[in-house]
Amino acid sequence: MRVLKYAILGLLRKGELSGYDITSYFKEELGQFWSAKHSQIYPELKKLTDEGFITFRTTIQGTKLEKKMYTLTDSGKQELHDWLIRHQPIPETVKDEFMLKAYFISCLSRQEASDLFKDQLQKRQAKLSDLQGSYEKLMASAEPMSFSSPDFGHYLVLTKALEREKNYVSWLESILAMIDKD
């Protein structure tokens, strides 16, 4: 299944966007739970155009730079809707290199294990701080949050990401206490 297809269709549901705009969403809001690179996005835009799910118009920026502005077609809206209402199985386990290292922690000295977990804790705390900043920005710019709010979907994934990182930080702290004990 081409999930990137649905991510792009969903973004275009908000309105007309350029490929650059779509890439920016993957670096910001969508980046909290989904990733896609420039090299993946543009071929997918071509496929979606060929399938009739999106169209584009070309604009000129400056004197020469052509910019494609993409919009969702009615069949693209229907394709997105059909995907949204389709129930999905729970995905396979996400690959997490740090957790693989944790599994083999007995190969490390106590100090090496502590250093590994401290490094991960620092990175997760920084990520949590970034997410908290995004949350504060969202809540300051939004009307009271409800199902009918235009940013409700962003609120959902952001609060889930916050909870995930809070739990990860808490878990790392408890494991560090165990490692450093004795």
UniProtKB/Swiss-Prot annotation:
Keywords: Cytoplasm, DNA-binding, Repressor, Transcription, Transcription regulation
A Pfam family matched in the record: PadR
SS bond partners: none
GO cellular component, one term: cytoplasm
Result for mutant: residue 70 to A: 3.7-fold reduction in the binding affinity
Subcellular location: Cytoplasm
Swiss-Prot/TrEMBL induction comment: Expression is low and appears constitutive.
Main localisation: cytoplasm
Residues under site feature: Important for activity. Contributes to protein stability and DNA binding: 70
Outcome, altering residue 100 to P: Retains the repressor function. PAD activity in induced cultures is increased 2-fold compared to wild-type strain
Result, substituting residue 63 to A: Retains the repressor function, but shows a reduced capacity to bind to the padC promoter. PAD activity in induced cultures is increased 2-fold compared to wild-type strain
InterPro entries: Tscrpt_reg_PadR_C, Tscrpt_reg_PadR_N, WH-like_DNA-bd_sf, WH_DNA-bd_sf
GO molecular function: DNA binding
Disruption outcome: Deletion of the gene results in constitutive expression of padC and constitutive phenolic acid decarboxylase activity.
Activity regulation information from UniProt: PadR repressor activity is inhibited in the presence of phenolic acids, which directly modulate PadR binding to the promoter of padC, leading to the dissociation of PadR from the operator DNA and expression of padC. In the presence of MgCl(2), binding is not altered by phenolic acids.
Effect of residue 113 to T: Retains the repressor function but is not completely inactivated by ferulic acid
Subunit structure: Homodimer.
Domain comment, as recorded: Contains an N-terminal domain (NTD), which harbors a winged helix-turn-helix (wHTH) motif that is used for DNA binding, and a C-terminal dimerization domain (CTD).
Family, as annotated: Belongs to the PadR family.
Biological role: Transcriptional regulator involved in the regulation of the metabolism of phenolic acids. In the absence of phenolic acids, represses the expression of padC, which encodes a phenolic acid decarboxylase (PAD) involved in the detoxification of harmful phenolic acids. Acts by binding to the padC promoter region, preventing the transcription of the gene.
Protein name, as recorded: Negative transcriptional regulator PadR
